[in-house]
Amino acid sequence: MIHDAVLDYYGRRLATCSSDRTIKIFEIEGETQRLTETLKGHDGAVWCVSWAHPKYGNILASAGYDGKVLIWREQNGAWQRIYDFSLHKASVNVVSWSPHEAGCVLACASSDGNVSVLEFKDNNSWEHSIFHAHGLGVNSVSWAPATNPGSIVSSKPSPKSTGNRRFVTGGSDNALKIWAFDAATGAYKLEREPLTGHTDWVRDVAWSPTVLQKSYIASASEDRTVRIWTSDPANPQQWNCKVLGFDAAVWRVSWSLSGNVLAASGGDNKVTLWKENLKGEWECVKSIEE
């Protein structure tokens, strides 16, 4: 079974991962695709793959049931495994690269309740931190935009700047938590009290890429709801919530590139698209069924 399929930044390469413990790389040309590489290194099903931004080279992360996060890099047509991270004690469910402005940084969410953050440094070395996030396991992670809301034009960061390193996690404790990088300690710290309201596992979280007036986070849950959390720059610690009801558990949420349309999918075999109207209410603008 194929668990994930992700195109690279330019849409020219497709990475897939499977229960057969492999990752496959395909070259995409028009309507055709050609298998160019099969990467082996995991000891169990591979749940997810994720491409880094091309400014850091052709770098791919993979994670799976074996609790490992593997980093792969292609140079001169050859793929090599350049880093193994194996401190998690259970399945790593998802990996997510930060916005490229914040560095080459990967957040990893695991069923052991921990989140790890791996950073690729200028000297080709890797640094990592790992911390406890959700008592019953972490199912999802999503980075905030590198630019704070309301500041469409920002000054160019210094070479040593870490940007706006914040992300949200969703867990089997039914909660969302927002984490922010503390440059003084070099650690990620809980930014505020957890966002609560879901009555079952949070399966997915997605932080909208918009840098307009508000921050938006969507969360999908086994409780048959999607919650859309909003925060105003004037009071960034205050998050308000709108609830969207569904007929089945909701597994995935994803924002459009502009951050104003939300796609949700789940156990009802539908993909629904949602948009905020002028009154601040969320409306289903399209439903796609199998």
UniProtKB/Swiss-Prot annotation:
SMART domains for this protein: WD40
GO biological process entries: COPII-coated vesicle budding; ERAD pathway; mRNA transport; nuclear pore localization; positive regulation of DNA-templated transcription; positive regulation of ER to Golgi vesicle-mediated transport; positive regulation of protein exit from endoplasmic reticulum; positive regulation of TORC1 signaling
Primary residence: membrane
Signal sequence residues: none
Annotated WD repeat ranges: 1-36, 41-82, 87-128, 133-189, 197-239, 245-284
Heme keyword on record: no
Transmembrane segments: none
Alphabetic keyword roster: Cytoplasmic vesicle, Endoplasmic reticulum, ER-Golgi transport, Membrane, mRNA transport, Nuclear pore complex, Nucleus, Protein transport, Repeat, Translocation, Transport, WD repeat
GO molecular function: structural molecule activity
Keyword Repeat carried by entry: yes
UniProt cross-references to Pfam families, sorted A to Z: WD40 (PF00400)
InterPro entries membership: G-protein_beta_WD-40_rep (IPR020472), Sec13/Seh1_fam (IPR037363), WD40/YVTN_repeat-like_dom_sf (IPR015943), WD40_repeat_dom_sf (IPR036322), WD40_rpt (IPR001680)
Subcellular localization(s) per the UniProt record: Cytoplasmic vesicle, COPII-coated vesicle membrane; Endoplasmic reticulum membrane; Nucleus, Nuclear pore complex
PROSITE patterns referenced in this protein's UniProt entry, alphabetically: WD_REPEATS_2 (PS50082), WD_REPEATS_REGION (PS50294)
Family: Belongs to the WD repeat SEC13 family.
Binding partners and assembly: The COPII coat is composed of at least 5 proteins: the SEC23/24 complex, the SEC13/31 complex, and the protein SAR1. Component of the nuclear pore complex (NPC). NPC constitutes the exclusive means of nucleocytoplasmic transport. NPCs allow the passive diffusion of ions and small molecules and the active, nuclear transport receptor-mediated bidirectional transport of macromolecules such as proteins, RNAs, ribonucleoparticles (RNPs), and ribosomal subunits across the nuclear envelope. Due to its 8-fold rotational symmetry, all subunits are present with 8 copies or multiples thereof.
Protein name: Protein transport protein SEC13
Organism, scientific name: Chaetomium globosum (strain ATCC 6205 / CBS 148.51 / DSM 1962 / NBRC 6347 / NRRL 1970) (Soil fungus)
Encoding gene (name): SEC13
